[in-house]
């Protein structure tokens, strides 16, 4: 962390003495720069290209040194578009890595990868900045305490609970609800836990980033009147950005989160949407840097790049960073190297299922594929563990019977299996839940369900006490009392129709 005595631009540190070079080659977002002998910049140093294009427009491009090539040349990746750059342009070595503003000044604001505000709300206090490249906390600084992080979402809290200070992956293909689930988590956590969040939009749709910002202002997560009371800082490097920006924007967001953890000693939530785009950006740059591609065309440094980001996301004795990462799964293939590498770092996985989304069950979290290292009786308690296991067994049995039902029909099943199917269908529907952030689509008010209420509801379904209720009564409700009330309403409606 650096305390800057004077307020300078947020992207890089003050230039003490200018070490100048010249562009000798441009290949898309990758630049080769020649420096004087003995004046070579270090790896990860920020370089600034300043000049004018052919129509007299001012150019200001920041790059990051990736390789030292020999012959006094370095290869750097641009953090913004390289349009208008020409060979021979002057390049200045800043002598330090990219540094971004950190602390309370970042709350309620939107930044780009360089830490520059992009929300037209004026400049940000840049007296306290921090470099985006730093090592992970030492082993002795880590905190190993195990505790559950309640989200208020039934299917998550019961079957794949999140660890406070852990890493959670949201897996799913395109259009199954990852971003909506992330927005709901930000909303619930800000309201129920009062925690500070940092949101890193890595290579996703600009429209979604804008929607999220407006949604946060409406829900009070961002306080427009007093930004210091906001609960989130936003860092965006969206789909339209060059790969250099998408590759580094995750580190910018993480740097801001680390300050809240290490200096302010807070529990922080770091959302990354989408970690796959981080890998994809690295893959785009990798070939231009002259590396041979690895499996399925990914960069050979995939594991190293992922590890350097993920190992910094951890709990220390000062505070914690709980990270929730959306993971796009290419062609719904979980064995693809990008999602497979991400799996190794996670404490819990929330897998979204296209089949459930097609049935209209939202959140479309697959109760059998989603896992958590926290679902152990010594951590969550016997009652929670036993209820979760029985729910999974019932749903697994229903899955096994589906082929028989499709061929022969329900009537060919034994009495016991018919009862299992009926309860499984109720459980499946009760795992759905109306979201606060989806009120505009569904027209139903959102529900936050505490863990004790969630366990009580599923125990009642498993016990058979609610066997007489219609299964549609369990669809898109909060706790079990709402389901029984809905059943009574349905009963009255059917009587009126008769």
Curated annotation (Swiss-Prot):
A GO term from the CC aspect: chloroplast thylakoid membrane
Gene Ontology molecular function terms on file: ATP binding; ATP hydrolysis activity; proton-transporting ATP synthase activity, rotational mechanism
SMART domains membership: AAA (SM00382)
Residues holding ATP: 172-179
InterPro entries: AAA+_ATPase, ATP-synt_VA_C, ATP_synth_F1_bsu, ATPase_a/bsu_AS, ATPase_alpha/beta_chains, ATPase_F1/V1/A1_a/bsu_N, ATPase_F1/V1/A1_a/bsu_N_sf, ATPase_F1/V1/A1_a/bsu_nucl-bd
Sequence intervals crossing the membrane: none
PROSITE patterns (UniProt xref): ATPASE_ALPHA_BETA
Enzyme class of the recorded protein, top EC level: translocase
Subcellular localization: Plastid, Chloroplast thylakoid membrane
Record's keyword terms, sorted: ATP synthesis, ATP-binding, CF(1), Chloroplast, Hydrogen ion transport, Ion transport, Membrane, Nucleotide-binding, Plastid, Thylakoid, Translocase, Transport
Disulfide-bonded cysteines: none
Main location: plastid
Signal peptide: none
GO biological process: proton motive force-driven mitochondrial ATP synthesis
Reaction catalyzed: ATP + H2O + 4 H(+)(in) = ADP + phosphate + 5 H(+)(out)
Record's bilayer topology term: Peripheral membrane protein
Subunit structure: F-type ATPases have 2 components, CF(1) - the catalytic core - and CF(0) - the membrane proton channel. CF(1) has five subunits: alpha(3), beta(3), gamma(1), delta(1), epsilon(1). CF(0) has four main subunits: a(1), b(1), b'(1) and c(9-12).
Chain's role: Produces ATP from ADP in the presence of a proton gradient across the membrane. The catalytic sites are hosted primarily by the beta subunits.
Assigned protein family: Belongs to the ATPase alpha/beta chains family.
NCBIfam families in the cross-refs: atpD
PANTHER family, A to Z: ATP SYNTHASE, ATP SYNTHASE SUBUNIT BETA, MITOCHONDRIAL
Protein name stated in the entry: ATP synthase subunit beta, chloroplastic
Gene source species: Piper cenocladum
